[in-house]
């Protein structure tokens, strides 16, 4: 008889980023004090769950978000590169509306195709590696629960893919807040529900 397995896909907490750049996969970006508090709130919310593994992206902010969750269950944080942030041409630059890289005509070619997208890792590639990460986690924690800590675009792309929606989207409409939890509920290897929560919301 199939058994229920849950994979909780957590977005990392707030990052210390005083210059406001798109940090992407750059090293050295750690959680802010608020981000650390958000990670602790997620750990509290998951404290009574049947967590048997905590797996994180190799980036510092994801590892720091995973640490208190793992500690509550007496587990070590494991690392899976499939959970890493998406690659982006604008990494290391400011990309806010009205300033930064978008004002430079030399980079406009990178914005030509929002459907792939032309400025970064293809959505289909993100979906493929995130699905691989979740499938590994599901098998690892069969009959129990596993936490995977990742990043906004990978988590949102995974959710779109698993729920049969198109992958290209308006980034402003992502339902994936800092330190949010997207819980994937499986009956055996069949996804039966997706539950979104924000345990760190103020």
UniProtKB/Swiss-Prot annotation:
Keywords: Isopeptide bond, Ubl conjugation. It comes from the Bacteria. There is a cross-link at residue 136 (Isoglutamyl lysine isopeptide (Lys-Gln) (interchain with Q-Cter in protein Pup)). One of its GO terms (molecular function) is phosphatase activity. GO terms for cellular component: cytoplasm; plasma membrane. The keyword Cytoplasm does not apply. PANTHER family: BROAD-SPECIFICITY PHOSPHATASE YOR283W-RELATED, PHOSPHOGLYCERATE MUTASE. This is Uncharacterized protein Rv0525. It comes from Mycobacterium tuberculosis (strain ATCC 25618 / H37Rv).
